[in-house]
């Protein structure tokens, strides 16, 4: 389907706006994935706060110019599915990683975080805000438990020495 100039400009502006406010980006090749599976992926992306769009490569290159994701321009070859995480940096990478496990034809091409290419696997393992808070609380809780154990051990050592 041929796009006229206004449609192309609208797509570039839409993707550029999504890229400007995004925390991270992931590029994938969805060739060979069934329509039902892609529909499911789109639904999951909306729920996770991920902007996802299939874009022509030249339009994608223009859209990311001047953003943190200009480093992705070399990965825009073949069918390009681009996703921008808006709420959590690892959301798109985690979504694509899980989807790739179920669909062997789905291939993650690249991921970018803070203006640099990064491994999608690493990006997918970033904890969410709630997970990070929980980990911090566990560390703080363990630190106080460790302090208690050391205090009790010191008291025991004092009693043994006396």
From Swiss-Prot:
Domain of life where this protein originates: Bacteria
Keywords carried by this UniProt record: Ribonucleoprotein, Ribosomal protein, RNA-binding, rRNA-binding
GO BP: translation
One Pfam family cited in the UniProt record for this chain: Ribosomal_L10
Presence of the UniProt keyword Protein biosynthesis in the record: no
Extent of the signal sequence: none
Keyword RNA-binding: yes
GO CC annotation terms, alphabetical: ribonucleoprotein complex; ribosome
GO terms for MF: large ribosomal subunit rRNA binding
Function: Forms part of the ribosomal stalk, playing a central role in the interaction of the ribosome with GTP-bound translation factors.
NCBIfam families, alphabetized: PRK00099.1-1 (NF000955)
Family: Belongs to the universal ribosomal protein uL10 family.
Subunit and partners: Part of the ribosomal stalk of the 50S ribosomal subunit. The N-terminus interacts with L11 and the large rRNA to form the base of the stalk. The C-terminus forms an elongated spine to which L12 dimers bind in a sequential fashion forming a multimeric L10(L12)X complex.
PANTHER family (alphabetical): 39S RIBOSOMAL PROTEIN L10, MITOCHONDRIAL
Full protein name: Large ribosomal subunit protein uL10
Protein's organism: Vibrio parahaemolyticus serotype O3:K6 (strain RIMD 2210633)
The encoding gene: rplJ
